[in-house]
């Protein structure tokens, strides 16, 4: 496999990830969440979606897989640790941090189905 093939595969995966994150964000908005950030990057890691519902800050990992179980299983302990660290930085910058509770969710995006939201997944 040449460099061009690998680059094309990476580009396709990135595009699929971006589309999946957008689909997940729209899905969460329809459920009453306010989207505050997409692909929020910090020096400690990235959060796919930062959302809020009232005084609840929700940090969402989006996984596109062929099955829901595979999507949930794809969020490793290391990824969870990075997301938690990044969320701590995000929370520290919020003026109303003291009154916010937090939750870590997963949204599984699978072909030909509605996304599935797993609240409090980790």
UniProtKB/Swiss-Prot annotation:
Source organism (scientific name): Rhizobium etli (strain CIAT 652)
Secretion signal, residue range per the UniProt entry: none
Gene Ontology molecular-function annotations: nucleic acid binding
One Pfam family this sequence matches: UPF0102
Record-stated family: Belongs to the UPF0102 family.
Protein known as: UPF0102 protein RHECIAT_CH0000358
């Amino acid at each position: 496999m040449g460099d061009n093939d690998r680059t094309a595969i990476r580009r396709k995966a990135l595009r699929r990830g971006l589309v999946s994150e957008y689909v997940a964000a729209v899905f969460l908005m329809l459920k009453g969440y306010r989207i505050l950030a997409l692909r929020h990057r910090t020096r400690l890691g990235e959060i796919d979606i930062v959302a809020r519902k009232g005084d609840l800050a929700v940090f969402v990992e989006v996984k596109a897989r062929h099955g829901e179980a595979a999507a949930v299983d794809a969020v490793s302990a290391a990824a969870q640790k990075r997301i938690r660290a990044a969320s701590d930085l995000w929370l520290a910058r919020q003026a109303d941090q003291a009154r916010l509770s937090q939750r870590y969710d997963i949204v599984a995006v699978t072909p030909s189905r509605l996304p599935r939201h797993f609240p409090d997944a980790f």
